[in-house]
């Protein structure tokens, strides 16, 4: 072990530590960070070399954060990244600084948004919040309105989690939906992600995702938002149902198949006649 440590440069150690952090299960960032900190035994090296991993983890996980003075949480995503550690809260039209290690928001300030698309963004946000409230009791959503490659684009992100460390499991749902505002019809693109970690009497992770493509009729803001939510609801319900059905199938078939019903000989042993078997005689003579 000592020889291995001598062979690893600081750069390699940080690279390995960063991978552990980025792949930390939902709700277990602090535990993984503390373990990596002990292994690396160099706080300055960890903070400076793995800072990008802290940020990437929060962006990938859609980490929700509460801003002092505002009621609702906002998600940390690449779509709200303003650079230099600042992020956008599109609903409240503010920017704020975010500490990726402490997961704290500070210094909220007014921030200009794209007025040309704000009415569309607001309509989708209103419909999306109602949907999330109905389907994800602990869920958070953030809706962005941005011009991308000259096209007015709506991006809706959803995050919902259950952290049950006392019961040895944690899980998180994430989904991202996007469409451009164009005459008549447009394409909706979505990606759904589930990640669950169970670690009582074992160590099992479920990591699953699904890409969605659908068409959306574009009319006025309110009606378009309503039709958009119908697509979201149908796709997410179908995905969650499929996950549940697959687990039931695995329970009924796959997991049972892991345990051999019969010995390799394909015949059951008659324990009452064990002495007549060769192995029984060998045991008797032992």
From Swiss-Prot:
Compartments it resides in: Cytoplasm, Myofibril, Sarcomere, Z line
Keyword set, alphabetical order: Actin capping, Actin-binding, Cytoplasm
Entry comment describing in which tissues the protein is expressed: Present in all tissues examined.
PROSITE patterns: F_ACTIN_CAPPING_A_1 (PS00748), F_ACTIN_CAPPING_A_2 (PS00749)
Domain of life of the organism encoding this protein: Eukaryota
GO biological process: actin cytoskeleton organization; barbed-end actin filament capping
Keyword Cytoplasm among UniProt keywords: yes
Single GO MF descriptor: actin filament binding
GO cellular component, as recorded: brush border; cortical cytoskeleton; cytosol; F-actin capping protein complex; membrane; Z disc
ATP-binding found in the keyword field: no
Protein family (similarity comment): Belongs to the F-actin-capping protein alpha subunit family.
Assembly description: Component of the F-actin capping complex, composed of a heterodimer of an alpha and a beta subunit. Component of the WASH complex.
Function: F-actin-capping proteins bind in a Ca(2+)-independent manner to the fast growing ends of actin filaments (barbed end) thereby blocking the exchange of subunits at these ends. Unlike other capping proteins (such as gelsolin and severin), these proteins do not sever actin filaments. CapZ may mediate the attachment of the barbed ends of actin filaments to the Z-line.
UniProt-listed PANTHER family: F-ACTIN-CAPPING PROTEIN SUBUNIT ALPHA, F-ACTIN-CAPPING PROTEIN SUBUNIT ALPHA-2
UniProt protein name: F-actin-capping protein subunit alpha-2
Lineage: Eukaryota, Metazoa, Chordata, Craniata, Vertebrata
Gene name linked to the record: CAPZA2
